[in-house]
A protein has these predicted regions:
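Short acidic/histidine- and often glycine-rich active-site loop of Leloir-type glycosyltransferases
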Residues: 325, 337-348, 352-353
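Conserved acidic donor-binding segment of nucleotide-sugar-dependent glycosyltransferases
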Residues: 347-359, 367-372
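A conserved mid-protein helix/loop that constitutes part of the nucleotide-sugar donor-binding site
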Residues: 17-22, 232-255, 273-279
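Nucleotide-activated donor-binding/catalytic signature segment of Leloir-type glycosyltransferases, i.e.
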Residues: 52-55, 279-295
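Short hydrophobic beta-strand element within catalytic cores of glycosyltransferases
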Residues: 332-335
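A short, well-ordered alpha-helix in the C-terminal region of glycosyltransferases
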Residues: 283, 360, 367, 374-388, ...
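Aromatic "clamp/platform" in nucleotide-sugar-dependent glycosyltransferases that forms part
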Residues: 296, 315
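Acidic anion/phosphate-binding donor-loop and adjacent secondary structure
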Residues: 162-167, 193, 202-231
Length: 420
């Protein structure tokens, strides 16, 4: 039996975390002993882990890092590692150099600095694994590279690497100690190799696995929108973070309110540190009823099913699981023309792309409202679309053992994967 370890930063309601759950389900096999270590020891999605996955955290908090309680818990973890274990002193040079570099760029990201402290302060795992996988960039990758014993090590990259704020100075050459790197899209691979061109031969694409049947089943369960609104419903799903550019979406909604021939209401499912700032902007523009921050929903799929249009207005992406979920449910999609999004949407075939500014978003939404037949065709083509390739999955299995093991395990899962 092969021992497989996954490490992830948190297990909150995020695209990478949900993609990990789908991967863990696809890996169910009597030939594998699967373990998971959550670096921060917190997150709401741990309750959805398959029963055959062994969670290694001695202490665990079922709260999101995006809530006040979760942020205090995370701060406590950082302080225990930084102060209790002396890492703030030992890593003072590293922290100051990177803080200065961030300040020079006008973009200070404390979370990127904390990942190194958390990774080095977390307990080292004593067991040796056949394959250890860092399923997210940052802390999980630092931990697997330096604190885990394994015959082989792999790391996943889910974002546009440099745009997200990562780079060589932060990473301390951690990828030199990784045997294989998987990126979730071709564009993410290209951007990662702009930072690390020397690792091209050990970097390949592994698309997020999407359980289409599960999404369609859950879309029929529970309730979605409960208000009595009878106009056009726009939906966006994602954390309230700067990357998602909700400020632009709010301004686009203000324009829609003035010029749309039909009532429009925009709903957002997600939580994050920007909530207060966004609520203030919504109040300032008088959009309290028109642009609604609804928080996290355990089952978001009835909302997808009930919306008229899915809009994904972001500054950059890796490969958006939210877009894939909207495609699985046959929704017309408007996304901003940026890395990640443009690889998922074929212009005027299964959706539309536009620049990231309020005027363009408003103009495209009005066009889609005015062309329902075209939008129905976009949704139908999106539903028929193959959402991912299994090539990356087969490559992943190959890291566990030789060709024979890869072929045996691939046969066990191929039917399930291709039916999604």
């Amino acid at each position: 039996m092969k021992k497989l370890l996954f490490v992830i930063n948190t297990m909150g309601y995020g695209g990478a975390e949900r993609a990990l759950l789908d991967l863990l389900k696809a890996l169910h096999s009597e030939k594998l002993q699967i373990s998971l270590f959550v670096l921060t020891g917190q997150g709401e999605l741990a309750c959805e882990l398959p029963p055959y996955v062994n969670r290694l955290n001695r202490q665990y908090k079922d709260c999101s890092v995006l809530t006040r309680e979760g942020r205090w818990y995370l701060l406590g973890s950082v302080l225990r590692a930084g102060v209790g274990k002396g890492l703030l002193i030992r890593r003072a040079g590293y922290l100051l150099r990177n803080l200065w570099a961030m300040a020079q760029k006008g973009r200070i990201q404390p979370d990127k600095l904390c990942w190194r402290i958390l990774a080095e302060g977390a307990p080292a795992l004593q067991e040796e694994y056949d394959l250890a996988v860092a399923y997210l960039e940052g802390g999980a990758t630092y931990y697997v590279a330096d604190r885990v014993k394994a015959k082989k090590k792999a790391a996943f990259v889910h974002i546009s690497y440099a745009q997200a704020g990562y780079g060589r100075a932060l990473d301390l050459d951690c990828y030199r100690r990784i045997d294989h790197i998987f990126t979730v899209s071709d564009e993410v691979r290209e951007h990662f190799l702009e930072v690390y061109p020397e690792y091209g031969s050990k970097t390949s694409v592994f698309h997020n696995l999407v359980d289409r049947d599960r999404i369609c089943r859950l879309a029929q369960e529970g309730t979605g929108f409960t208000d009595a609104f009878s106009g056009v419903r726009i939906l966006t799903v994602g954390r309230l973070t700067p990357q998602k550019r909700y400020d632009v979406a709010i301004e686009a909604m203000a324009r829609l309110k003035q010029c749309s021939p039909v009532p429009v209401r925009w709903y957002v499912l997600g939580e994050g540190a920007l909530r207060g700032q966004l609520e203030q902007k919504i109040r300032h523009l008088g959009l309290e009823k028109d642009f609604q921050l609804m928080g996290v929903r355990k089952n978001p799929y009835p909302y997808y099913r009930s919306c008229d249009l899915y809009v994904h207005a972001t500054g950059f992406e890796g490969k958006s699981l939210a877009i894939q979920e909207a495609q699985a449910l046959g929704k017309p999609i408007l996304a901003t023309d940026c890395i990640g999004n443009r690889e998922q949407i074929r212009q005027d075939v299964d959706g539309r792309l536009c620049p990231l500014d309020p005027e363009s978003l408003c103009r495209e939404i009005l066009w889609m409202i005015d062309h329902p037949e075209e939008c129905r065709a976009y949704g139908a083509r999106a539903r028929e679309k193959t959402l991912y390739s299994t090539k990356g999955f087969t490559e992943f299995l190959g890291l566990l053992d030789g060709a024979q093991q890869r072929e045996e395990m691939s046969c066990e899962t191929e039917t399930v994967l291709l039916s999604r």
